[in-house]
Amino acid sequence: MIILGIDPGTAITGYGVIEFIGNRYKPITYSCLRTEPDLPLDLRLKKLYQGLMDIIKRYQPDCMAVEELFFNKNARTALAVGHARGIALLAGANSSIPVAEYTPLQVKQAVTGYGKAEKQQIQFMVKTLLSLPEIPKPDDVADALAVAICHAQWSSTFGGRIK
């Protein structure tokens, strides 16, 4: 199973494509999509959509996993993440890819075994589980890989959480 994990954001959207066979993870590609802060929101979202569609066409994932929006005290930040999440969900739907959504707590639990794990613990486990030479940067990339790992765990244990 090839999984595309997404950590959405309008400035930086992390993505990671992994292959999950049996109980083994294989990283295929990981990076981030960036948009210029001086661009109008509609153009930033268009650029994000085009980037995600390019990734989907190139790697042809079997499914997509997107991190759910968590409560944020900054309403502007929460709205921006919400816009980016919508674009990711749209890209998956337009590509006829099943999309699963996971809360940060579920991602932490799946990757580290502890729902209140710190960011450094998650990053270390992503590096370890994927046998990477170093922790992926920026943080959004490691988070996207963690979401993909989470989906692999949920899929193998509970049959996935496809919405």
Swiss-Prot record:
Gene (name only): ruvC
Lineage, broadest ranks: Bacteria, Bacillati, Bacillota, Clostridia, Eubacteriales
HAMAP family the record matches: RuvC
GO aspect biological process, one term: DNA repair
The enzyme's E.C. designation: 3.1.21.10
Residues of the signal peptide: none
UniProt subunit comment: Homodimer which binds Holliday junction (HJ) DNA. The HJ becomes 2-fold symmetrical on binding to RuvC with unstacked arms; it has a different conformation from HJ DNA in complex with RuvA. In the full resolvosome a probable DNA-RuvA(4)-RuvB(12)-RuvC(2) complex forms which resolves the HJ.
Cross-referenced PROSITE patterns: RUVC
Binding sites annotated in the UniProt record for Mg(2+) 1: D7, D140
Matching CDD domains: RuvC
GO cellular component term, pick one: Holliday junction resolvase complex
Function: The RuvA-RuvB-RuvC complex processes Holliday junction (HJ) DNA during genetic recombination and DNA repair. Endonuclease that resolves HJ intermediates. Cleaves cruciform DNA by making single-stranded nicks across the HJ at symmetrical positions within the homologous arms, yielding a 5'-phosphate and a 3'-hydroxyl group; requires a central core of homology in the junction. The consensus cleavage sequence is 5'-(A/T)TT(C/G)-3'. Cleavage occurs on the 3'-side of the TT dinucleotide at the point of strand exchange.
Active site: D7, E67, D140
Protein name per UniProt: Crossover junction endodeoxyribonuclease RuvC
Primary location: cytoplasm
